[in-house]
Every structure is written in C-alpha cells, then in structure tokens.
C-alpha cells in the first residue's frame, strides 16, 4: 500500500481530530456533561453512520439472545413486528448514554463505543492500544511506506506502526494503560466500592422502615407497664436470685406417673414458685384493655393456652451464659439437669435452648412484653368465640413489635 496523500507539512493525510482538553486529566463517566459539550463543539469528529458487522455488533447479537422473553421465541415460523424491532436493535449495537449514536473513532473512523484512554475510540483501537503498551510491542513495529499510511477502518490492520502513531497523535494516554497487577488492584477496588454501595443502600433501606405511630406508642406503653408490674425482681433479678443447691435435682429418684423419674426435693421447690408465677401471668393479662374487653370464657381459654408459654419465655430471657442457669420467677436459678429432674423433663431442654438463643438478642422489657402479648392473643386456641377479634389484637401487637424493633435499631 502507498500513501494516498500528504498534508502541506508532510504529516499523514488522516483527518486531525483535536485532542481532549489539557485541563481534563482523565475521561470519567461522572464528568460526561462537560465531555459532551466539548465533543459537540468539534463537528469535524462526526461522520455518517455506516452499519457494518463489527465485533461489537456481533457481541451485541449474542447478548440479545440471552434477553429474549418467552413470547419472543414462542412462534418462530412467522416474522412479526416485534421480531423486526429486535433485529433492528441488534444492528445498532451498544451505545453508552453519554455518546451520540453516530460518534466515530478518532483513530480509524469506525463506530465509537466510548472514551478509552482519554479518547473516543472503537473497541478495536482500544484493544490494539492496550496490547501494544502492556506488551511493549511498539519498538518492534515498522512501516513499509515511511510512516505515511492512511489509517481507517479498512487499512488499520495493515500497518501497526502508523496505527500506533495515530493513537498517540489523537491523544490516547499511555499512562492510563494498567499492567496486570494494577488492573487486578483496580478490579479489587471496584468490587470493594460496589460492596460498599450495596451496604450503604441496605442501611438506607433499613432506615426507611416505619417506626411506631402515636397510637402504637400508647399500646407499647400499656403493655410494657403491665409486664414490669408483674415481672418478679424486674431488672435486678441477677442480684436477687438464689441458686438451687447443687445436690438437689442431680438425679431422678422417684417414678413419675408418666413413666419417668422425678427428684422430689427439686419438684417441691418448683411447685412453691409455680403458683405465684401463674398469678403474675394472669395479672399481666388483666392489665391489658384489649384482653379485658373479651368475654370471660375467651379470657379463660387464652390464659390456659398461654400460661406455660409466657412463664417459659420469662424464664428463657433470664438465662445466664456464665453460670448456664435459668432464673425461675425471678428468684431461683437452676441448671438444665435440675429443671429436667425436677419434673419438666424434655420441656426443660426447650426452655434452655430458647434462653441460649435469646441471650444474643439482648431483649429489653418492651420487647419481652410485646412477645408476651402476642402469645396471649393466640386466635388458634380451641373453643374461642371471638376469633377474628383476637386475631386483630394479635396483629396490632405484632405490628407494634416490628415498628419498635425498627425504632430501637435506628436509635
């Protein structure tokens, strides 16, 4: 190939697009408004759009296949308007939002795909420039025609030296080409920033969760006061608890009616505290206006159904990981074996396991109170008359519980 023409100064006869402004050290997506203004002020960079099957368009066809809906492939026997639209979209290829669809590569005049190494180029020239710098190939390039080749999309692969010189001439920056280590570091930084944005977005979404309304705050206040007034020893249970002697309840010694064995001494201690514990649960329920509005028959059914559950919850939230004990009724600290041999059997394992799980949540009095109210208002108890009403009450406590958790997390 021979050079087609020369300029007056003896430079190659390619069009000379102006390089990017000196004040812009690197093209970035965040500054595209200024970049677009600069680009539009240089009409000599524009040219007619020519549809050719470039590697970019070929890649876009492959990408489009993976985005077809079921309707797109349901009938392949006859063409449709949607099929023509899909085919037309394939031919256009990917165009960044900041780039005009008819923007041309400043090196070869092919269809540009974006800003690469500080210039508007196609994928081919971007890859050529990157490989040349990364592998230090330019010293080995040589031109057969004294460095005067015209570089366009047809001839660009025929002379590497002239193509590289034009890349430099139009302003492509060698310092922006990263080696393997820098490229891996950049990729790692991108992943870290993406993860950071994901966490921030998650925190923002959590921050928008609703908190209690004024009406719910009134309900929360009533339930919390009812719990505090009927919870033995309150928040001072650790200071006031007494440990059951170690020699009590270590081994079952008497056969129980169900076929198991019970330590009578431990059983005697437990029966002494069970009656006041039940009384406190009843008092808690009576302090809730919603409960008092229910028929007496429903009140009895609800209390029979939830009494053991609420007492177990109150014991579970007083689990001490250090001593591995539960404090019953706010006064008696017992081990798992003592509770099991004292008559509770396998139920003791469930209560201890619940206590171990709840200990990591650090529940406050309000959360425990609302959980008790939810257990109390269980509409699935057999024999209830006001099922829908009780279910509505439970939903109110559940919603208040959720909103209070949001409030506590954000405060």
Swiss-Prot record:
Zinc finger residue extent: NR C4-type: 105-125, 143-167
Transmembrane portions of the chain: none
Gene name of this polypeptide: THRB
Assembly and oligomerization: Binds DNA as a dimer; homodimer and heterodimer with RXRA. Interacts with the coactivators NCOA1/SRC1, NCOA2/GRIP1, NCOA7 and MED1/TRAP220 in a ligand-inducible manner. Interacts with the corepressor NCOR1 in absence of ligand. Interacts with C1D. Interacts with NR2F6; the interaction impairs the binding of the THRB homodimer and THRB:RXRB heterodimer to T3 response elements. Interacts with PRMT2 and THRSP. Interacts with TACC1; this interaction is decreased in the presence of thyroid hormone T3.
Region (Interaction with NR2F6): 242-411
Residue span of region Modulating: 1-104
Domain NR LBD: from-to ranges: 215-411
Domain text: Composed of three domains: a modulating N-terminal domain, a DNA-binding domain and a C-terminal ligand-binding domain.
Protein name as annotated: Thyroid hormone receptor beta
GO cellular component: RNA polymerase II transcription regulator complex
Residues where 3,3',5-triiodo-L-thyronine binds: 280, 329
Residues that hold Zn(2+) 1 according to the record: 105, 108, 122, 125
Intracellular or extracellular location(s): Nucleus
Keywords: DNA-binding, Metal-binding, Nucleus, Receptor, Transcription, Transcription regulation, Zinc, Zinc-finger
Protein residues bound to Zn(2+) 2: 143, 149, 159, 162
Binding site for L-thyroxine: 280, 329
Source domain of life: Eukaryota
DNA-binding region (UniProt annotation): 105-179
Coiled coil: none
Function noted in UniProt: Nuclear hormone receptor that can act as a repressor or activator of transcription. High affinity receptor for thyroid hormones, including triiodothyronine and thyroxine.
Main location as per UniProt: nucleus
Lineage of producing organism: Eukaryota, Metazoa, Chordata, Craniata, Vertebrata
Family matches, as SMART domains: HOLI (SM00430), ZnF_C4 (SM00399)
